[in-house]
Amino acid sequence: MSETIRKNIIFIFLLLGVCMTAQEKKQLGSIPQVLKSIIPDDRIDFWVLVHNHYGKNEELKISGAKKDYVPQSSGFNLFPEEDSFYYIAYSKAGKVDYITDLSGLKTFIGTIDNVEEAVIDATAEGYFIDEEFKNVAGNYYQDASNYYIDLGKLTSKECPYQKTHFTLTVNKSSGKVTGAKNNGTYIELYNKKCTNNPRLLKIEKKEVPADEPQKTKQPVRRK
């Protein structure tokens, strides 16, 4: 084998290794970690991320010289049906203001700077990181042009309670979602009140109809 061929083979293997590393899926951080990765678009003097859990405020991140702010009684969630909420207090040109909903959060983020901001942006459209099932709804990989993010979405609230996982393609330059691949349902739950519960339907099929004539017993012959 010539030296040139050997070098070409080594180069190909190195190139394949780089491609495989680039497409290796990584788990997204927890919801607080994702929120702490925000890089505001505007010139902000100060901002603080606050988590309110059962009325108790916890400051998760402080950026800039801290200023006085008023604790908020409501805020936003990045996961459906949470028992807590988040809000952001920030100061711009000396004026303190607050972020308490996802629409305001999107404006605060502005241009998508990282995969965490891409996830937050998608949350406004109903997608979320599922902390319990990150292997299907809480991971991503990337290449030079796009983020490929696996997230969950609540597609039915009852009969059944259903979660579906999607792969979103987010363009790094524009920050826009250019594709949403439906990967199917990963959670489907029926409660006792659901008339369309497959288990109940199977039981009903097995039951004998009330109007069906019963078989008469044959008399036992004695020898």
Where are these predicted regions, by residue range?
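Bacterial N-terminal signal peptides that target proteins for export
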Residues: 1-9
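Surface-exposed acidic loop/strand-edge motifs in secreted or periplasmic proteins
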Residues: 40-140
